[in-house]
């Protein structure tokens, strides 16, 4: 039986205990039998132990066993005493060997035998004693001689021999006299039927074999080698027959050590015939035929291990699995052994162990180690693996949870092998289960929660690829989701982990490529998820793989580089996909052309060159959208790897060399495509030199190939770009001959600028060349025609973006450093002279409208190049009977130009005056002023813009003609009279008829007329006449709408009419107020007239449109001021409406919710009106009641840096002027304004580009509301009392600070001191000066 070392009793400590003095033990007296005292030992209790008596007792078989047992027990007790033990060891220890061995060999009583073996073991364990070697010698002799025969006594001897060989302090080999005889006797004993004896023999053989190989004892090893064939056969037979786990364990241990030393492999290599003859010689009872009929060793081994594999003892199973592993792995060619074991169903037993193992680590590891070897027999093992597939999946769960599990790789290999060999074996639930486990492994690997072996990472990627090929893979969305997440984790882990290597990246990219192939295949089941998967692949490439690849390309080997490029190429091949287009643009924005040639420099192989040029050709197909990448593919075999070599080829004559011509076409295409994306493959000087050489040497072929316009224009783009960069960066010489040839080709042959992709700088260079003006005019006409039909081509590249040719052409015109504006105006002039090409005129006018809409500043260059004269010529050619689309388009252009042109430009171009007069005359010839059509509305809008520009000193004479035009005076009065006559029905009439549009344009024209009057008729207008009655209209020299009519329109009109009429009234009253102030006049109107106006305006103070409410409050404030000057404010003392307005405002500002600036702005009209009442000489008494101490204190309490506006500061200043603030409130206000000022300085100046007003653009439309809305915007942004939308934060802040400064000056004036704000202002000014 096999014993662990821990089972051995150890008494070494006995010799290390305290011992008495050496003289302590005196000589013992003779024993009762008269034996000498020298062989008698005294114990600590005073007793005497005679060794001869003990020997006679244990050796005599006639002595009762109880006496023997007692003697052994007494000896055991005595030995436990240190002095006794020391005396025994010093003189008499060897006297015990013979009697104990004799007793062990002659006693059948098991308990006595056990006592004897324990005694022997105890004696041998003492380090200072050599008695163990005597026991080994005597027992081995007994076993070698075979004198005892195979009996139960022999069992005790075998067991004792095994125990002795387990003692480490005994030199076993040197005291076994005849190793061959001993081993022969033991091997023969294996044929005995007793399982106990076989177990002890196997244990003894195991210990003997282990000892020989450990000490490398040549004799012992030779004996084992000679007897190994027979030993192997008998051991396997014993293993196959036994049902005892202890016997199995000993046998497996013996076979394992033989297998580890290669003896099993050597035995297997011997031929069956020689083995049989040896056995015949050894055993005459066997014939050669009988031996030959026995099963071969591999089959015997397979049958023998099945029993241990079925054992319920996990230790037996583990040891057996280890035996299988060593048995197979020691073979130089183990395929035959594996084949036999698989055919004998050993794999099925192992899978069953896995199924029942409950994922115990040792069992799982041993099973996986053997199964990994079995997988070498691919053909036979596949079928067995299918049976055990569920068990392997269960193990995968366990392995996937353990970081760097030692058999991680083996498990994954089994999964991969089964799925790849039998794609249909995995059900949808199993596929989902596997995908989820692998996803978690990759996720934890990326997060560094667990480790993965490099091979394990590769197999996981391979398993996913195999899973994608299974029929049930795409049946559930969860599987594809797991794949999507796994893909992302695998790439990120490969790129970001410290231990990244190119091999791992290669496998991750392989998975990425296969996933993309799967999700783009037509056989994919879940189309929606596949689209998401494809997007995921592209996102991973763009967000992670591409940036890493571009930055760390030198760390990637060639194979990984090819794999990454293959994936990128696969995406590009889906050129119909929007994301493929975006990916291509991302590549070129990262200088992919330069990067590709850099890769060719690192890996100059045919595979790399082919991959790069094919990818570049696909990139060109997508970017240029003309399938021109075929030029690169056609010349693939002869293209060089260096851009410098491409330039060299480009500079050669190729008229007689088709292969060279093909290379040159590809080179031109590559340099052209890279250049439009600002990717420089070579120095511009070298490129220009090669291009010039190419042009000069191949001018004949260029002329012959002029039909291939894209190829020519690729050359033009490259040439123009190099020339433009040469002008910008440095001055270098260039070939006049090459330039002449290029200009000749462009002037003499037809080409289309919109048919190719071109760089902005190249386009700009072309339009700077006066020599090709004729050809450029033709190109402009093509651009206009494409723009007219909406067939714009986005083929110009600049500022890192691809835009339409029209857009960049507009930019050229706005910049003005080229002939684009001049050529465009000249083209329109030519068409105007011909007078029969209306469609061409319309296309050019539409193009100009588009240009001005894109870049409003282009209006200035168009005007400076004479567009006004051309427009005047066109307008003069129209009559009422010949109006058409061209006239409407022309009016739109005039409107657009006047919205964006600078007044200074209009001042130097007299043609705009003529245009204005023509349009005014056109309007005067219309039949009616009410039923205005589209042209009438636009003309009125244009006249309004002319009046608007007069405020800045431009078109003053034209404006004077407009405001004094008798037709306009009559038409405006007619429209207003009709509208006012409707009364309350005006709103309904506006919805049902065109009176609303006519009235809106009429009021807008009137507003800009009022603003222009002080410029064009300075001092000649009596503003008092605007208070007159309607009967005096014909006596007025200018356009006029009386105040009461404006009030009617404000009261009854629609929201837009209310708004425009309110601005007209505000403008009118402002002019009147200035006249009254300057001339110190009195109002020439009755009190009832003003009362009716105040009734309307007072009601509109609470209008929903804050602009109308503000205008009404401002108008009402001016009227109250006039009345106050004449002492007509008695009605305020009793007016409950004005008091209600003031109370509503004060209560609202005193509420805590007024902290919002929006809420304060809502009450701005009431603030204006309240300020006006506070400024009256005869203030209403109730103001003091409204603004009592508690109300004002609450208002001050609510002030903060957000809601303090210019109006709020004015309000409190007027309250202080009216003595409604006490000193404490003034102090609090002063402190609040100081905090607000500090906060403004802390915030600094905001980015004024955020505040910058974007120029409004009028597209080519026929909706009157667009024109009207623009004019309303223009009116609102330039009206009194309303800050312009272009007003910056800094300007608004300055207004508030100025009002605070005035408030502080008022405080200092009243108190005779310098305010803190004034002092702070002085300090800041001093700091700025310093």
Curated annotation (Swiss-Prot):
The reply to whether Kinase figures as a keyword in the UniProt entry is no
Q: What does the entry state regarding organ or tissue expression?
A: Expressed in flower buds.
Please provide the record's keywords in A-Z order.
DNA-binding, Hydrolase, Meiosis, Nucleus
Q: What happens when the gene is disrupted?
A: Plants exhibit reduced fertility and meiotic defects. Drastic decrease in chiasma formation at metaphase I associated with an absence of synapsis in prophase, due to the inability to make double-strand breaks (DSB).
GO cellular component labels: nucleus
Q: Which domain of life is it from?
A: Eukaryota
Q: Which GO terms describe its molecular function?
A: DNA binding; hydrolase activity
Q: Which portions of the sequence form the region Disordered? A: 1310-1330
Query: Which BP terms does GO give this entry?
Result: meiotic DNA double-strand break formation
Q: Where in the cell is it found?
A: Nucleus
Q: What does this protein do?
A: Involved in DNA cleavage that forms the double-strand breaks (DSB) that initiate meiotic recombination.
Q: What PANTHER family is this protein classified in?
A: PROTEIN PRD1, PUTATIVE RECOMBINATION INITIATION DEFECT 1-RELATED
The record comments on the domains as follows: The N-terminal domain (1-802) but not the C-terminal domain (755-1330) is essential for interaction with SPO11-1.
Cite the record's note on assembly: Interacts with SPO11-1. According to PubMed:28855712, may interact with SPO11-2; this is in contradiction with PubMed:9461215 which claims that it seems to not interact with SPO11-2. Binds to DFO, PRD3 and MTOPVIB. Facilitates an interaction between PRD3 and DFO.
What is the protein name for this chain?
A: Protein PUTATIVE RECOMBINATION INITIATION DEFECT 1
Organism name: Arabidopsis thaliana
């Amino acid at each position: 039986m096999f014993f662990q070392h821990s089972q051995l009793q150890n008494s070494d400590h006995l010799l290390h205990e305290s011992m008495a003095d050496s003289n302590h033990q005196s000589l013992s007296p003779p024993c009762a039998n008269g034996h000498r005292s020298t062989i008698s030992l005294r114990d600590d209790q005073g007793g005497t132990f005679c060794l001869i008596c003990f020997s006679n007792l244990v050796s005599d078989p006639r002595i009762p066993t109880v006496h023997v047992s007692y003697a052994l027990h007494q000896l055991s007790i005595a030995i436990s005493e240190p002095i006794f033990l020391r005396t025994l060891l010093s003189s008499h220890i060897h006297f015990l060997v013979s009697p104990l061995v004799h007793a062990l060999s002659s006693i059948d009583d098991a308990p006595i035998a056990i006592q004897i073996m324990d005694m022997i073991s105890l004696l041998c364990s003492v380090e200072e004693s050599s008695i163990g070697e005597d026991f080994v010698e005597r027992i081995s002799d007994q076993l070698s001689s075979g004198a005892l025969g195979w009996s139960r006594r022999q069992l005790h001897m075998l067991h004792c021999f095994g125990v002795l060989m387990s003692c480490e302090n005994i030199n076993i080999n040197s005291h076994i006299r005849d190793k061959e005889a001993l081993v022969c006797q033991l091997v023969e004993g294996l044929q005995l039927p007793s399982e106990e004896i076989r177990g002890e023999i196997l244990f003894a053989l195991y210990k003997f074999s282990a000892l020989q190989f450990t000490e490398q004892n040549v004799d012992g090893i030779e004996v084992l080698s000679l007897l190994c064939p027979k030993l192997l056969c008998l051991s396997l037979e014993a293993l196959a027959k036994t049902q005892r786990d202890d016997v199995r364990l000993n046998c497996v241990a013996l076979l394992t050590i033989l297998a580890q030393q290669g003896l099993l492999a050597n035995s297997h290599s011997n031929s069956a015939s020689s083995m049989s003859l040896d056995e015949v010689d050894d055993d005459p009872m066997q014939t050669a035929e009988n031996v030959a009929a026995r099963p071969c060793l591999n089959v015997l081994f397979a049958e023998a291990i099945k029993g241990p594999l079925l054992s319920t003892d996990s230790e037996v199973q583990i040891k057996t699995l280890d035996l299988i592993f060593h048995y197979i792995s020691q073979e130089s060619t183990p395929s035959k052994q594996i084949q036999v074991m698989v055919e004998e169903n050993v794999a099925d037993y192992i899978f069953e162990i896995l199924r029942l193992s409950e994922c115990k680590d040792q069992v799982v590891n041993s099973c996986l180690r053997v199964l990994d070897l079995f997988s070498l027999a691919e053909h036979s093992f596949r079928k067995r693996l299918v049976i055990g597939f569920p068990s392997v999946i269960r193990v995968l769960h366990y392995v996937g949870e353990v970081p760097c599990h030692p058999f991680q790789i083996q498990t994954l290999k089994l999964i991969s092998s089964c799925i790849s060999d039998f794609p249909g074996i995995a059900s949808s639930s199993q596929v989902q289960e596997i995908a989820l486990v692998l996803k978690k492994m990759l996720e934890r690997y990326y997060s560094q929660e667990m480790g993965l072996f490099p091979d394990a990472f590769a197999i996981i990627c391979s398993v996913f690829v195999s899973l994608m090929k299974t029929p049930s893979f795409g049946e559930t969305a969860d599987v594809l989701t797991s794949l999507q997440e796994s893909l992302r984790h695998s790439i990120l882990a490969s790129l970001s982990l410290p231990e990244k290597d190119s091999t791992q990246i290669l496998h991750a990219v392989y998975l990425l490529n296969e996933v993309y192939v799967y999700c783009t295949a037509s056989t994919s089941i879940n189309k929606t998820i596949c689209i998401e998967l494809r997007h995921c692949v592209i996102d991973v490439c763009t967000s992670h793989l591409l940036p890493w690849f571009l930055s760390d390309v030198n760390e990637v080997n060639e194979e990984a580089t090819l794999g990454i490029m293959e994936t990128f190429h696969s995406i590009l091949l889906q050129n119909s996909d929007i994301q493929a287009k975006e990916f291509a643009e991302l590549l070129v924005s990262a200088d992919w052309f330069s990067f590709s040639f850099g890769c060719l420099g690192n890996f100059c192989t045919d595979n790399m060159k082919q991959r790069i040029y094919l990818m570049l050709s696909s990139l060109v197909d997508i970017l240029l959208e003309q399938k021109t990448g075929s030029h690169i593919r056609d010349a693939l075999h002869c293209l060089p790897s260096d851009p410098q070599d491409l330039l060299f080829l480009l500079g050669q004559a190729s008229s007689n060399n088709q292969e060279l011509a093909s290379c040159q076409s590809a080179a031109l295409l590559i340099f052209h495509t890279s250049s439009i994306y600002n990717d420089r493959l070579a120095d511009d000087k070298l490129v220009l030199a090669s291009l010039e050489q190419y042009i000069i040497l191949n001018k004949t072929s260029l002329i012959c190939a002029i039909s291939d316009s894209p190829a020519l224009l690729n050359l033009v783009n490259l040439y123009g770009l190099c020339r433009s960069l040469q002008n910008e960066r440095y001055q270098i010489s260039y070939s006049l001959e090459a330039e002449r040839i290029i200009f000749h080709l462009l002037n003499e042959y037809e080409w289309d600028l919109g048919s190719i992709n071109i760089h902005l700088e190249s386009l700009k260079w072309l339009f700077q060349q006066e020599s090709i003006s004729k050809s450029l005019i033709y190109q402009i006409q093509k651009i206009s025609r494409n723009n007219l039909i909406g067939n714009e081509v986005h083929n110009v590249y600049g500022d890192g973006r691809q835009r339409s040719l029209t857009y960049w052409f507009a930019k050229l015109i706005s910049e003005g450093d080229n002939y684009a504006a001049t050529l465009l105006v000249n083209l329109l002039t030519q068409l105007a002279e011909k007078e029969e090409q209306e469609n061409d005129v319309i296309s050019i006018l539409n193009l100009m409208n588009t240009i001005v809409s894109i870049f409003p500043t282009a209006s200035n260059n168009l005007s400076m190049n004479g567009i006004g004269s051309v427009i005047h010529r066109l307008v003069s050619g129209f009559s009422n009977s010949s109006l058409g689309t061209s006239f409407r388009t022309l009016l739109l252009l005039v409107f657009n130009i006047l919205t964006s042109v600078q007044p200074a430009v209009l001042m130097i171009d007299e043609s705009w005056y003529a245009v204005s007069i023509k349009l005014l005359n056109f309007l005067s010839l219309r039949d009616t002023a009410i039923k205005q059509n589209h042209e009438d509305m636009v003309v009125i809008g244009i006249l309004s813009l002319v009046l608007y520009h007069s405020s800045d000193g431009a078109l003053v004479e034209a404006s004077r003609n407009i405001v004094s035009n008798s037709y306009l005076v009559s038409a405006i009065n007619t429209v207003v009279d009709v509208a006012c006559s409707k009364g309350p029905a005006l709103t309904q009439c506006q919805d049902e008829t065109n009176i609303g549009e006519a009235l809106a344009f009429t009021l807008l024209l009137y507003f800009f007329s009022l603003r222009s009057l002080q410029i064009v008729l300075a001092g000649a207008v009596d503003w008092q006449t605007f208070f007159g009655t309607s009967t005096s209209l014909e006596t007025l020299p200018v356009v006029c709408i009386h105040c009461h009519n404006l009030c009617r329109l404000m009261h009854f009109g629609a929201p837009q009419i209310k708004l425009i009429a309110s601005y007209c009234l505000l403008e009118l009253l402002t002019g009147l107020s200035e006249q009254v102030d300057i001339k110190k006049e009195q109002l020439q109107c009755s009190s009832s007239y003003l009362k009716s106006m105040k009734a309307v305006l007072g009601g509109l103070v609470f209008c929903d449109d804050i602009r109308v409410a503000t205008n009404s409050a401002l108008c009402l404030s001016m009227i109250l001021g006039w009345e106050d000057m004449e002492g007509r404010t008695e009605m305020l003392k009793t007016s409950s409406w004005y008091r209600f307005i003031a109370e509503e405002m004060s209560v609202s500002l005193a509420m805590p919710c007024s902290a919002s600036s929006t809420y304060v702005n809502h009450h701005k009209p009431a603030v204006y009106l309240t300020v006006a009442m506070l400024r009256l000489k005869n203030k209403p008494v109730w103001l003091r009641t409204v603004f009592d101490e508690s109300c004002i204190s609450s208002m001050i309490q609510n002030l903060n840096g957000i809601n303090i506006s210019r109006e709020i500061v004015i309000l409190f200043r007027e309250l202080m002027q009216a003595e409604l603030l006490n000193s404490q409130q003034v102090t609090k206000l002063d402190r609040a304004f100081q905090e607000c000022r500090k906060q403004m300085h802390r915030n600094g100046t905001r980015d004024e580009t955020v505040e910058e007003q974007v120029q409004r653009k009028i597209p080519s439309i026929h909706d009157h509301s667009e024109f009207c809305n623009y004019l309303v915007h223009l009116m609102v942004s330039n009206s009194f009392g309303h800050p312009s939308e272009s007003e910056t934060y800094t300007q608004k802040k300055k207004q508030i600070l100025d009002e605070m400064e005035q408030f502080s000056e008022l405080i200092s004036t009243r108190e005779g001191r310098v305010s803190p704000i004034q002092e702070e202002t002085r300090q800041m000014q001093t700091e700025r000066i310093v």
